């Protein structure tokens, strides 16, 4: 083969390769971020959540069927206030039974839902939910036994925001969709038509394409100043080490059920499955900046990853932030200070140990059994739980809350203590769990792996609180 033919052959191979790449890797312009609709429960206004299929374009101009709420992919953002009584109306318009959970919400199990309250097709449920806890970012989603991974993956997930007087009066960005931006992260695997593909029998699920609010690598125009990002990891098995592509520092201000006592300056944050974090980034100066997963990649890195099925994301861009306009007059660092969690419970009623076997989806050498209660707790009590695992993993608990006493033998500093309901740890962790709400034998709370594939396969336990 002479040089010209060899060159032509090489160019043909590259052209063929590039034609197969996702459009977001090649597009000169990205799509603007879609902000989920906001539903507020004020003056007794009910919150309607219809579980149903929808038609959307995940890639290109190809309409595909997905699941979600109220005719859209994923769910609207529900925003409530401490002291509210929320009239919540679920309606299951899907051809499958679905159990719903609001991860992080603190209330009794008969109101929260969970695996003990499954909605059959065309069935509704209307609990009145008292909002008693402080400000938090929660997560409503499917928790159906043995089907939660698939149903979440199809789109049964949304953000639930709780505000209180303290959070509303704090000097923090609070204009929804403007400088207070919700981001729901998912990793998907799509066929050529843009439909979701799911591998049911795998121990974990890792999609090769990263979506935020149902879009791949979008952008958002924002005014100059401090921007607040509320990040929810709604992926099945993937955790996300997040940073900015220019490696700038930012402020971590909240996790799961509340604010840190004071903001923590970081350059990266790891967000496990089901976990919610809130960060502040300073966009007073400079140009565009992208929130990414892991390290910044070159275009050739992206091409290489596209042709290697190694579980990595082909594009690791979460969102590009494009600041515009004049420098904000109020460009100083936001200052706030919230009440510490943090009188840790002084009386520990009981200590328990749980070992997670990720390979076999077991807790303490047992798989989930709906007839077995794994934890009987006293309402109002605190317990110390020691968690260990064969591999790094995510943990979650329903209807209760905890503070992380230590992780991998490193004690949590007092200024980082915050109420949580999810946790990512490498080997071991000690948590102090507070049980403030009741759960019956017929409608228990659950705990276990936050990897929904693992939970569906048996890494799940039941809690009764009386």
From Swiss-Prot:
UniProt keywords, alphabetically: Cell cycle, Cell division, Periplasm, Signal
GO BP field: FtsZ-dependent cytokinesis
PTM characteristics: Predicted to be exported by the Tat system. The position of the signal peptide cleavage has not been experimentally proven.
Cited Pfam families: Cu-oxidase_3
GO cellular component, one term: outer membrane-bounded periplasmic space
GO MF annotations, alphabetized: copper ion binding
Disulphide-bridged cysteine pairs: none
Localization: Periplasm
Gene3D superfamilies, A to Z: Cupredoxins - blue copper proteins
TM regions (residue ranges): none
Region forming the signal peptide: 1-28
Similarity section: Belongs to the FtsP family.
Function: Cell division protein that is required for growth during stress conditions. May be involved in protecting or stabilizing the divisomal assembly under conditions of stress.
Protein name (Swiss-Prot/TrEMBL): Cell division protein FtsP
Name of the gene encoding the protein in the UniProt record: ftsP
